[in-house]
Curated annotation (Swiss-Prot):
It holds the Pfam family Peptidase_A8. Keywords: Aspartyl protease, Cell inner membrane, Cell membrane, Hydrolase, Membrane, Protease, Transmembrane, Transmembrane helix. GO terms for cellular component: plasma membrane. The keyword Isomerase does not apply. The keyword Nucleotide-binding does not apply. It is found in: Cell inner membrane. This is Lipoprotein signal peptidase. Optimum temperature is 37-45 degrees Celsius. One of its GO terms (molecular function) is aspartic-type endopeptidase activity. Its main location: membrane. Enzyme activity is inhibited by globomycin, a cyclic peptide antibiotic. The lineage of its organism: Bacteria, Pseudomonadati, Pseudomonadota, Gammaproteobacteria, Enterobacterales. It comes from Escherichia coli (strain K12). Residues 1-11, 89-95, 160-164 are cytoplasmic.
Length: 164
């Protein structure tokens, strides 16, 4: 018996689209208005700074000759498919997990688009304290981290099934 998509976690796929629109829109604005390396202060400890990342988080494998582009693209596709299957197998009422999965998929697809279209990921958020700067990142990275944090949080919450 087939189930309605609205009764599964796939009901939350709209959030993937929202993450993609916001992420790709922010990257488009950076590409149209900034030269590589340009910085604009927003608030104390927060700048907009156009950087290119040819690797993964913290520029991991950025200087590896180009193969990493396809490696990380494959990881993004694989994770997105696995999480979409998990969403399909979960109930729409399992909000925290489905929101987390949608955020991760949206972020992964946003960075995947950059890797395939530009050959690098557009980063623009520069958080700093004094002279110390955290690695420059983007909104897709933020969505992935928030999604991962929600999965960890869900692991600490009491299960409703155990209460019944």
């Amino acid at each position: 018996m087939s189930q309605s998509i609205c009764s599964t976690g796939l009901r939350w796929l709209w959030l993937v689209v929202v993450v993609l629109i916001i992420d790709l829109g922010s990257k488009y604005l950076i590409l149209q208005n900034f030269a590589l390396g340009d910085t604009v202060p927003l608030f104390p400890s927060l700048n907009l700074h156009y950087a290119r990342n040819y690797g993964a988080a913290f520029s991991f494998l950025a200087d590896s000759g180009g193969w990493q582009r396809w490696f990380f693209a494959g990881i993004a596709i694989g994770i997105s498919v696995i999480l979409a299957v998990m969403m399909y197998r979960s109930k729409a009422t399992q909000k925290l997990n489905n929101i987390a999965y949608a955020l991760i998929i949206g972020g992964a697809l946003g960075n995947l688009f950059d890797r395939l279209w530009h050959g690098f990921v557009v980063d623009m958020i520069d958080f700093y304290v004094g002279d110390w700067h955290f690695a420059t990142f983007n909104l897709a990275d933020t969505a992935i981290c928030v999604g991962a944090a929600l999965i960890v949080l869900e692991g600490f919450l009491p299960s409703r099934a155990k209460k019944q």
